Amino acid sequence: MPELVRPTVDVHESWLEAVSEPGYEPRWADDLQLADMTHPEGFAIYVRRQLQDEHEDAPRSRGMVPSTHLWYVDGAHFIGRLSIRHRLTPWLRDYGGHIGYDVRPSARKQGHASAMLRQALPWAAKLGIDPVLVTCDVGNVPSRKVIERAGGEFEDERHGKLRYWVPAT
């Protein structure tokens, strides 16, 4: 059964398959390239950075905030990723929210995004984030439905983004 877990090197092969799927836009550290992560050592560096990013003193790009990164996996099969941002900047308040998520294209329309968001809410609550701001593009009907099914209450639209507050508890 798929579950949210901390990033792990155990899904390296499946992660590489996912990031090569057309339409998938993975996110990684500015100084790492996909070519670096095809090697186990480079991927281990990426995983370590993902895990360290939740710490306040971790190095990060300007404007970024501490975030807990989680991967949605079924055994060694990588399905998607989710990030919980520990606080909101003015930009995140308008555009990004507390939680951002992606499902690999070959696994979309199977309920994974809904399960990921549902499983992430207790993680957010443990971080003291309640309610959780989740945003989506105005035209992204599937994501809007995911947020609404999780109990998201629509607040407003800003800059082409729909903004919802989702109870974490």
Describe each PLM feature range:
Residues S114, V138-D156:
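Conserved active-site alpha-helix within GNAT-family acetyltransferase domains
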Residues Y101-Q110, G139:
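Active-site acidic-Proline motif in GNAT/NAT acetyltransferases
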Residues M1-H98, P105, W123, E155, ...:
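GNAT-family acyltransferases
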Residues G111, G128, G151:
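Short glycine-rich hinge loops at helix-strand junctions in the catalytic core
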Residues A107, G111-Q119:
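Conserved acetyl-CoA pyrophosphate-binding loop and the N-cap/start of the following alpha-helix
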Residues A124-T135:
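Conserved GNAT acetyl-CoA-binding A-motif
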